[in-house]
Swiss-Prot record:
Residues 590-648 are annotated as: Metallo-beta-lactamase C-terminus. The keyword Nuclease applies. This is Transcription termination factor FttA. One of its GO terms (molecular function) is RNA binding. Changing residue 258 to A: Significant decrease of endoRNase activity. Residues 185-395 are annotated as: Metallo-beta-lactamase N-terminus. Its EC number is 3.1.-.-. Zn(2+) 2 binds at residues 257-258, 364, 615. EndoRNase activity is inhibited by 1,10-phenanthroline. The gene is fttA. Binds 2 Zn(2+) ions, which are required for nuclease activity.
Length: 648
């Protein structure tokens, strides 16, 4: 370790020599240090660098590093003074709603209803803010819905700024350590989510680095730890955790089967490194993780982890936008690309060993446009191995066309409301809920739906997070929000359910209603309570719009089971008779169906040498792998959990 520190110090010494030659003296450099995947140059006079628009680019080109210029902490105005000055500089018409300081990066976030007025003509107002307060301003439009999750994350990052900076410096020194070995081999090991859906975890190993992609929990199998959690018993994984060798964890998206076990690692001090993901994924996975342990507690179970462990996840997360390239170890470079599955979902591209090998790991993805998101990216700089999901990889897994699915949804709703019934749509709080909301809002606007739409569980909070990241939404939605001035998420037809009393009032009411409630597979959350009480009435309908995993209550109901034993409030088992109509409309899935999966392999560029199918029931993974090999002549594999494949 001492040797590694000495090596990094020498690298920094060499860098300082180059920077001092290229940066004008009036910038007054005070410190140069690696922080996370960036080289940070602290200066007392940032304007001296900013006035030369090409200097940072030239530095990055020479040093082959991502460069960030930050004001020296000593020149930053105290937050109270800086905030007062910002309000004096920015016109009142900008309607600033929030100012948040992040001392760990010397940045001030300014939320305003009219961000253009904060920026000013040709950026004049922004430059004046920088000049006067020294903090680096970041301007965003005020989200129309306030998210408690986003607020609490900002508070944590601000209060933990000193620890955060220390952590980032440790990460930076680890990334830019001198490699002990030249990259010669690459392997991947399935720790979860191979020939199954749930607990996704993939370990990438080189002779220099260890990187984990996803670390999820199978919420449908919590009573069986061997099926619920990734394989901690894998010898190589035990070794990596014990020796503290894991360089990074990358999270493709927020759903618990991909992110749900992250806090567990911090609870038991198994990991202290960086987590890379997109900003929306960070916020959404924190929301889902908190809800997960709250549901466990309400069910009388010991939660897998504590709120303080989720706080550690926040402190250790480094966010990247789509297309940003970052070094995450001496021989691995990461880029995240749109996956089209849920807000912020990403395809992980790993460039290994300076051209030795390139891997794209799709996570969950969708390859057609939806109301909510653009289709998954299929173009990469280089690509040799493609690891892709197979949720709907079976030969007959053809989803209903989206237009037909929407018409069918409205048809079932009309029939149910006409007979005085209620419609229950169990939906994942993140993704399917917002997709269905957009469909219902569109039809309600033209008068095709005339009933209240209730949103229960975390759906409203998740929707608030969606409104905070409009740049991640579909082009059509962005046009509606910014050009047409209409935000469909704010429609009057949506009514968030605040508590259990309101929930019971909706159930007891004689009025027809549409209810969208989490969870999507009926494995906890308010959707289960609605189901219990609405199922016996034949006037009601339940509509499944997303995948129902094996072993879930949702799969039982979907499969036609008409009598289901369930535990009541007093702990007694009661048999629920399912007299309500049961419908499945698969055209709303956030997963690519068989045609999309095959089309993705046909369209992805460059064409990979090898395709590995994961995240699907065994036969679907095998079927997809076989079909890809036959049609495209590519090498394919459908490995099991614990299988290791050498890629190079």
């Amino acid at each position: 370790m001492i040797k590694r520190e000495t090596q990094v110090d020498q690298i920094l010494k060499d860098i300082r020599g180059i920077v001092n030659q290229m940066v004008p003296r009036e910038a007054k450099i005070t410190e140069i240090e690696f922080e996370g995947p960036e080289l940070v140059i602290y200066v007392k006079n940032p304007e001296a660098i900013m006035k030369d628009g090409e200097l940072i680019k030239d530095l990055a080109k020479v040093l082959k590093k991502r460069i960030s210029i930050r004001p020296d902490p000593d020149v930053l105005l105290p937050p109270e003074e800086a905030e007062k000055l910002i309000f004096e500089i920015v016109p009142k018409e900008a309607e600033i709603t929030n100012i948040a300081f992040d001392p760990s990066v010397g940045e001030v976030l300014i939320e305003a209803k009219k961000p253009g007025l904060v920026i000013g003509k040709n950026g004049e107002t922004l430059r004046l803010i920088t000049q006067k307060v020294k903090w680096a301003p970041k301007v965003v439009r005020t989200p129309p819905l306030q998210s408690q999750t986003i607020y609490s994350i900002r508070q944590i990052l601000q209060s933990e700024s000193k620890d955060r900076r220390k952590f980032l410096r440790q990460v930076g020194r680890n990334i830019y350590r001198k490699p002990e070995y030249k990259s010669r081999w690459i392997r991947i090991t399935g720790l979860g989510g191979f020939r199954e859906v749930g607990r996704s975890a993939l370990l990438v190993q080189t002779d220099e680095s260890y990187v984990l992609v996803d670390f999820g929990v199978n919420v449908a199998a919590l009573n069986d730890p061997y099926k619920a959690f990734p394989h901690f018993d894998a010898p190589e994984f035990q070794y990596v955790l014990k020796e503290g060798l894991l360089d990074a964890i990358i999270i493709t998206h927020a759903h618990l089967d991909h992110s749900g076990m992250l806090p567990y690692l911090f609870r038991y001090n198994l990991f202290d490194g960086p987590i890379y993901t997109t900003p929306p994924t960070r916020d959404l996975m924190v929301l889902l993780q908190k809800d997960f342990i709250e549901i466990q507690q309400s069910n009388g179970q010991d939660p897998l982890y504590r709120p303080r462990d989720i706080k550690e996840v926040i402190k250790h997360t480094i966010t990247l936008d789509y297309g940003e390239v970052r070094d995450i170890s001496p021989d691995i470079r990461l880029t995240l690309h749109n996956a089209g599955h849920i807000l912020g979902s990403a395809i992980v591209h790993l460039h290994i060993g300076n051209g030795l090998h390139n891997i794209a790991i799709t996570g969950d993805f969708k390859f057609i446009p939806t109301r909510l998101l653009e289709p998954a990216n299929a173009k990469f700089p280089r690509l040799e191995t493609l690891v892709m999901e197979s949720t709907y990889g079976g030969a007959n897994d053809i989803q209903m066309p989206r237009e037909e699915a929407e018409k069918r949804l409205i048809e079932v709703i009309h029939q149910t409301l006409k007979r005085g019934g209620k419609v229950l749509i169990p939906a994942m709080a993140v993704g399917r809920a917002q997709e269905v909301m957009m469909v219902l809002e569109d039809y309600a606007r033209i008068g095709a739906i005339d009933a209240p739409i209730y949103l229960d569980g975390m759906i409203w909070e998740a929707t608030a997070i969606h409104t905070a990241y409009p740049e991640y939404l579909s082009r059509r939605l962005r046009e509606q929000i910014f050009k047409e001035g209409y935000n469909p998420f704010l429609s009057e037809i949506f009514h968030p359910v605040a508590n259990s009393k309101e929930r019971q009032d909706i159930i007891d009411s004689n009025e027809p209603a549409i209810i969208i409630a989490s969870s999507g597979m009926l494995v906890g959350g308010p959707s289960v309570e609605y189901f219990k009480q609405l199922a016996p009435d034949p006037r009601n309908s339940i509509i499944f719009v997303s995948y129902q995993a094996e072993g879930t209550l949702g799969r039982q109901v979907q499969s036609g089971v008409r009598e289901i034993p369930m535990v009541g409030e007093e702990g007694r088992t009661e048999v629920i008779k399912v007299n309500m109509e049961v419908h499945t409309i698969d055209g709303f899935s956030g997963h690519a169906d068989r045609r999309e999966l095959m089309n993705y392999v046909a369209k992805v560029r460059p064409r990979p040498e090898r395709v590995i199918t994961v995240h699907g029931e065994p036969q679907k993974c095998l079927d997809l792998a076989t079909s890809i090999h036959r049609k495209f002549g590519l090498s394919t594999r459908a490995p099991n959990n614990l299988d290791t494949i050498r890629l190079r």
